[in-house]
């Protein structure tokens, strides 16, 4: 279902929900109400946008065309323009989902519509908290993740991931109710790669900026699950795992910059992510990713940047395990980006290739230094 863009300066009617889509940068609006006539907004729009110029005779008779208060009240009641709060809509959607789920021949298209509406709402912080308080995880999320319909599972995982974005209260609830194990089981066992992809999206929302969840992830064999996925042929999910690992490693580095956050620093140290990655053959996976990023996605500089970034964060640990082919590729990339930085820009950014040159050059220099030290 598409959403109409919000026009600048346009007043948003009551009951219309608006959000910024962080993936596209587009402002989206959606009318979420099961009891409004479908043409209600159109009726309002027609009333407000189609005022003909008044003739003198029309002006003279204007008083006689006015409707009294009772008539106006009746007209508005017919439109049913009594806006509901987000909390009321959330509760109605949850109750409707529960009712449909109990039916023997349940309407799965209706369930998908409900999940879409809920996902739209939980992007807002307070709505996500209300979703938790209304037992939405148990009655909807965990219930649907046992479904056989892959589309329902995908939409449910999207709902789960969206509810946890930058919301520590929801993350805590997800962790305490077993989300880590559930998501890892999906990543390990589900045969639909699109479901795995959404599970990784939800897992990323849970782990970022939440060291205690990261600890539970590694303690529950999360890196073993990742290692198996790195051995698969799905480059898309491997790139997402690489990005998540990069972010978690960077979090640990950043935590040490604030010496006052003693407890937070200790939490990251307890995870021992870097050491655990080495045990789970992460250096070998990086070798493979570096080669594939050039061979398979030679013109996708964003993917290459992720691989270089991952290697930069782990170069001290992985330098001795890099293959000659990987080292040659990094050297070639350095030469390529030196030339491109002198001649081209990307989307008006003249420093894009310069940044990639600096990154690849730093890796080369570090590898050479480690070799000399050995």
Predicted segments, located by residue:
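Residues that form ligand- and interface-recognition hot spots within folded domains
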Residues: 135, 221, 230
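Buried hydrophobic core positions in alpha-solenoid tandem helical repeats
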Residues: 93, 97, 139-142, 182-186, ...
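Internal amphipathic alpha-helical repeat/solenoid segments
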Residues: 75-152
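Recurring C-terminal helix/loop segment of individual leucine-rich repeat
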Residues: 129, 172, 212-215, 275
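Alpha-helical solenoid repeats of the armadillo/HEAT superfamily
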Residues: 2, 7-73, 102-119, 148-162, ...
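Extended intrinsically disordered, low-complexity coil regions enriched in Ser, Thr, Gly, Ala
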Residues: 132, 272-274, 327-331
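Helix-rich alpha-solenoid scaffolding regions
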Residues: 132-185, 193
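Short loop-to-helix capping motifs
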Residues: 124-125, 166-167, 210, 317-318
């Amino acid at each position: 279902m598409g959403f109409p863009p919000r026009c600048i300066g346009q007043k948003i009617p009551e009951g219309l929900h608006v959000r910024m889509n962080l993936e596209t940068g587009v402002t989206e609006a959606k009318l979420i109400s099961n009891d409004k006539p479908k043409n209600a907004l159109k009726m309002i729009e027609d009333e407000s946008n189609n005022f003909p110029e008044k003739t003198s005779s029309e002006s003279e008779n204007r008083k006689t065309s006015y409707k009294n208060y009772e008539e106006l009240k009746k007209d508005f009641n017919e439109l049913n323009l009594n806006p509901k709060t987000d909390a009321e809509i959330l509760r109605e959607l949850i109750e409707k989902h529960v009712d449909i789920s109990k039916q023997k021949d349940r309407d799965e298209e209706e369930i998908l519509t409900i999940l879409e509406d809920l996902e739209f709402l939980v992007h807002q912080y307070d709505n996500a908290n209300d979703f938790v308080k209304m037992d939405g995880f148990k009655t909807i999320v965990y219930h649907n993740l046992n479904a056989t319909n892959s589309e329902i599972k995908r939409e449910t995982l999207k709902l789960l991931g969206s509810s946890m974005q930058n919301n520590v209260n929801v993350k805590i609830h997800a962790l305490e109710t077993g989300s880590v194990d559930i998501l890892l089981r999906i990543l390990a066992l589900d045969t639909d790669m699109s479901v795995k992809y959404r599970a990784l999206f939800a897992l990323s929302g849970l782990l970022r900026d939440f060291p205690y969840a990261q600890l539970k992830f590694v303690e529950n064999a999360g890196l073993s699950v990742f290692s198996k996925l790195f051995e698969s042929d799905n480059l898309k999910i491997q790139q997402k795992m690489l990005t998540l690992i990069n972010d978690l490693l960077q979090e640990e580095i950043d935590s040490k910059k604030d010496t006052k956050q003693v407890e937070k620093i200790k939490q990251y140290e307890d995870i021992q992510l870097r050491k655990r990655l080495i045990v789970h053959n992460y250096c070998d996976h990086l070798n493979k990713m570096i080669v594939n990023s050039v061979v398979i996605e030679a013109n996708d500089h964003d993917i290459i940047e992720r691989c270089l970034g991952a290697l930069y964060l782990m170069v001290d640990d992985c330098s001795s395990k890099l293959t000659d082919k990987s080292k040659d590729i990094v050297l070639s990339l350095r030469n390529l980006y030196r030339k491109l930085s002198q001649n081209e820009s990307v989307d008006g950014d003249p420093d894009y290739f310069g940044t990639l040159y600096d990154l690849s050059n730093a890796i080369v220099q570090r590898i050479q230094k480690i070799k000399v030290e050995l």
